[in-house]
């Protein structure tokens, strides 16, 4: 009787440990979102063949930018990629493994895959520009493909952003 209770308790604890160790979306957001988007773009005819999945992933990577492009580089989906662990993604996808599990396997092979993070968007309607760093102010202008010629001081960048704000900032209704 005591042995069965002990076995049940151990099984329960193992299950709890397994769910707490599972990869969460915020722990590996770029990988999970990219793998989900890629898997959703695949035709049913391709989903079972890992070689075709790899070919499609290389095509998919040619259109990616920023963090997704870096993710493709890490996996070996780009011509200039130094390493290639593409089969660590394509084979599990061919078995219909969920994106979280695929990224968990990829993280074991290359931890930097889960170091990729999307940059947090700044809400220009509620943020106090004076409290932002100059680097963040420059990033706002860069995201808008705008420049600030002659800007030296923080106040110069703030003034330029305020001038352009009506053109780029979305107002909530």
UniProtKB/Swiss-Prot annotation:
<dbReference type="InterPro" id="IPR045332">
    <property type="entry name" value="ARMET_N"/>
</dbReference>
<feature type="signal peptide">
    <location>
        <begin position="1"/>
        <end position="22"/>
    </location>
</feature>
<dbReference type="InterPro" id="IPR018247">
    <property type="entry name" value="EF_Hand_1_Ca_BS"/>
</dbReference>
<keyword id="KW-0964">Secreted</keyword>
<dbReference type="GO" id="GO:0005783">
    <property type="term" value="C:endoplasmic reticulum"/>
</dbReference>
<dbReference type="GO" id="GO:0005615">
    <property type="term" value="C:extracellular space"/>
</dbReference>
<dbReference type="InterPro" id="IPR002048">
    <property type="entry name" value="EF_hand_dom"/>
</dbReference>
<keyword id="KW-0217">Developmental protein</keyword>
<dbReference type="GO" id="GO:0071542">
    <property type="term" value="P:dopaminergic neuron differentiation"/>
</dbReference>
<protein>
    <recommendedName>
        <fullName>Mesencephalic astrocyte-derived neurotrophic factor homolog</fullName>
    </recommendedName>
</protein>
<dbReference type="InterPro" id="IPR019345">
    <property type="entry name" value="ARMET_C"/>
</dbReference>
<keyword id="KW-0732">Signal</keyword>
<dbReference type="GO" id="GO:0042417">
    <property type="term" value="P:dopamine metabolic process"/>
</dbReference>
<keyword id="KW-1015">Disulfide bond</keyword>
<dbReference type="GO" id="GO:0070050">
    <property type="term" value="P:neuron cellular homeostasis"/>
</dbReference>
<dbReference type="InterPro" id="IPR036361">
    <property type="entry name" value="SAP_dom_sf"/>
</dbReference>
<dbReference type="GO" id="GO:0045202">
    <property type="term" value="C:synapse"/>
</dbReference>
<dbReference type="GO" id="GO:0005509">
    <property type="term" value="F:calcium ion binding"/>
</dbReference>
<feature type="disulfide bond">
    <location>
        <begin position="61"/>
        <end position="72"/>
    </location>
</feature>
<dbReference type="Pfam" id="PF10208">
    <property type="entry name" value="ARMET_C"/>
</dbReference>
<feature type="disulfide bond">
    <location>
        <begin position="31"/>
        <end position="103"/>
    </location>
</feature>
<comment type="function">
    <text>Required during the maturation of the embryonic nervous system for maintenance of neuronal and cuticular connectivity. Essential for maintenance of dopaminergic neurons and dopamine levels.</text>
</comment>
<feature type="disulfide bond">
    <location>
        <begin position="148"/>
        <end position="151"/>
    </location>
</feature>
<dbReference type="InterPro" id="IPR045333">
    <property type="entry name" value="ARMET-like"/>
</dbReference>
<comment type="similarity">
    <text>Belongs to the ARMET family.</text>
</comment>
<dbReference type="Pfam" id="PF20145">
    <property type="entry name" value="ARMET_N"/>
</dbReference>
<dbReference type="GO" id="GO:0031175">
    <property type="term" value="P:neuron projection development"/>
</dbReference>
<dbReference type="GO" id="GO:0001963">
    <property type="term" value="P:synaptic transmission, dopaminergic"/>
</dbReference>
<feature type="disulfide bond">
    <location>
        <begin position="28"/>
        <end position="114"/>
    </location>
</feature>
């Amino acid at each position: 009787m005591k042995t069965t209770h002990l076995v049940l308790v151990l099984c329960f604890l193992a299950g709890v440990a397994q769910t707490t160790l599972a990869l969460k979306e915020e722990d590996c957001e770029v990988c999970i979102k990219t793998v989900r988007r890629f898997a959703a773009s695949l035709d049913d005819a391709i989903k079972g063949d890992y070689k075709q999945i790899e070919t499609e992933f290389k095509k998919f990577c040619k259109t990616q930018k920023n963090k997704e492009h870096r993710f493709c580089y890490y996996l070996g989906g780009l011509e200039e990629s130094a390493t290639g662990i593409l089969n660590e993604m394509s084979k599990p996808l061919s078995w219909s493994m969920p994106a979280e599990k695929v990224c968990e396997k990829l993280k074991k092979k290359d931890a930097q895959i889960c170091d990729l993070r999307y940059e947090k968007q700044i809400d220009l309607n509620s943020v106090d520009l004076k409290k932002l760093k100059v680097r963040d102010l420059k990033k706002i202008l860069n995201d808008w493909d705008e420049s600030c010629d002659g800007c030296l001081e923080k106040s110069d960048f703030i003034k330029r952003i305020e001038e352009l704000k009506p053109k780029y900032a979305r107002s909530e209704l």
